[in-house]
Amino acid sequence: MTRLENMYKKEVVPALIKRFGYSNPMAVPRLVKITLNMGVGEAATNKKVLENAVADMAKISGQRPIVTKSRISVASFKIRNGWPIGCKTTLRRSKMYEFLDRLINISLPCVRDFRGIPPRSFDGRGNFNMGVKEQVVFPEIDFDAVDAIRGMDIAITTTANSDAEAKALLDAFNFPFRN
């Protein structure tokens, strides 16, 4: 059991039951999955870029990502239907908690001029989305071996019914929200 899983069971669940008045511990919001997505627009012209993006995401997530393909042809972007244009991976259970722990305690403090994450990134249904502009903030990525700086999208899916419940859940995990 990871550190954040243990913290969730021993500290977060009782705190959220006390705050929101849940009658059952199973009604307390929990993390379902974390989805990492990296769109690589240059992959249409250079296939090596996509291979490097897949390798970076595999190092960051600890599992092999799937390559996403374009759904439609867009002439202005010079892509066709079915061409590989990015990669994504979904983390669940212990890998999810390990990634969240590294994100909160190691990666986000390494971001330049970091003053916290804006709390308006919730979607209205208890899920949280954020972006990271540089993949080099993760300790698994060697800065000297990176061919290009690429960002990624991080989507945290919870069982919370409202944004207030989801924010309380992430606050309990010491998520660095801006005041």
UniProtKB/Swiss-Prot annotation:
Q: Note the superkingdom of the native organism.
A: Bacteria
List the Pfam families hit by this protein, alphabetically: Ribosomal_L5, Ribosomal_L5_C
Keyword Kinase set for record: no
Q: Spell out the NCBIfam families in the cross-references.
A: PRK00010.1
Record note on quaternary structure: Part of the 50S ribosomal subunit; part of the 5S rRNA/L5/L18/L25 subcomplex. Contacts the 5S rRNA and the P site tRNA. Forms a bridge to the 30S subunit in the 70S ribosome.
Which protein family is named in the record? Belongs to the universal ribosomal protein uL5 family.
Record HAMAP family: Ribosomal_uL5_B
Q: What is this protein called?
A: Large ribosomal subunit protein uL5
Give the organism, scientific name: Xylella fastidiosa (strain 9a5c)
Organism placement in taxonomy: Bacteria, Pseudomonadati, Pseudomonadota, Gammaproteobacteria, Lysobacterales
The encoding gene? rplE
